[in-house]
Amino acid sequence: MDIKAILANLEAKHPGEHEYLQAVTEVLHSIEEVYNQHPEFEKARIIERMVEPDRIFTFRVTWVDDKGEVQTNLGYRVQFNGAIGPYKGGLRFHKAVNPSMLKFLGFEQTFKNALTTLPMGGGKGGSDFDPVGKSDAEIMRFCQAFMLELWNNIGPDTDVPAGDVGVGGREIGYLFGMYTKLAREYNVGVLTGKGATWGGSILRPEATGFGALYFTEHVLKTAGKELKGCTVALSGFGNVAWGAALKATELGAKVVAISGPDGVCEIPAGITKEMIDYMLEMRASNRNKVEDMATKYPELAKFTPGKKAWSVKCDIALPCAFQNELNGDDAKELIANGTWCCCEVSNMGCTPEAIETFQKSGILFAPGKAVNAGGVSVSGLEMTQNAMHISWSGAEVDEKLHYIMESIHSACVKYGKKADGTIDYVKGANIAGFMKVAQAMLEQGIV
């Protein structure tokens, strides 16, 4: 495999798409050795086909705000790879959304979904619509307008969107309601992340954070350590960070920091159950300010503007917000403060420089495509329940989530174990996901 030639070709065709090219570069370097052991992959041009999406839908979304003024946004759906199942991946509503971001997310989703053991291809979508400061009515009208353009390209056996940044249970409800109106059928399998009373799965809101902590437990256990008693700093205060904080606390860790775009809240005594519950209120307010936590609980939390969670002394760092949120300087600051483990809960939450710094320093590090796979895993379980017209209990879903995260960890260890006995989780996750997708593509012919 000529990595330089492949990347040069991609850069020429997709100039300026930095996130997408970053994601592809990481995977290619991880799989180069194993890829070169399979000449049949080279003959079928598996890599050249795998790094390009099957198709991308781009559309205008026109809606009316509360002042009666017409607004327009761009909407996208990237159907990246469907070799092992229907396209599956979230919808992101954020002002920074662009094709590069969604292609990177769709590419990562392909490998993540392959790791879950479930039959799901990779996809991603969203819009540059900014929900911050919007009323509930405006969000509803936007979701309806978005689905008006998307509905004919999705379906339970074609492409199954879900939530992501800016898209939670409320938005999924509005999207599903409009889909039902347009399609004139009640097909619960077309979206996941639905309410538990109308086709959703119990534990889906918590799944990404819960799964991340289950995976982190396996990472620590393999290294001869345990989570109980550890201090944890995490970024964000949305659905993912909420689930991570909740499960970390349940498992005996102490969450000492959460952060937002405005700064960091340090919580020396550890976050409480009431504070964790308040995280959901903060996100629902659309204010996007973590300072609200310190305002609500001034005796427990101290807010520092302009700082990141990585400035707070901790044992374990959990990036839970956005791509490239933890850079090389942040990694050095964490190491200087005694951090010995970082597990990405956000997609590509660490820059290449940060990952290199962690790995060279012997810090335990695991990538998002493995760590945060619990969310899409329970989405896959929701698809199964919808197809069978049944509903599993929370205990049943949690048991299956435990099994999936353990299986993902085992796959990472299988392909990432080094001669000295340590685990390269980045390499392990990339190879495990790649081998499954590549074999499926090979067996299905040149299509």
Model region roles, listed by residue range:
Residues 2-23, 219, 333-447:
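Adenosine-phosphate binding glycine-rich loop
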Residues 94, 113-228:
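Glycine/serine-rich phosphate-binding loop and adjoining beta1-alpha1 elements at the start
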Residues 59-120, 124, 128:
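Phosphate-interaction motifs
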Residues 40-71:
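Structured beta-strand/loop patches that form or line metal/cofactor-binding pockets in enzymes
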Residues 263-365, 370:
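Rossmann-like adenosine-cofactor binding region
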Residues 18-21, 37-44, 117, 154-163, ...:
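Flexible, glycine/charged-enriched surface loops at secondary-structure junctions
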Residues 192-195, 200-313:
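Glycine-rich phosphate/diphosphate-binding loop of Rossmann-like nucleotide-binding domains
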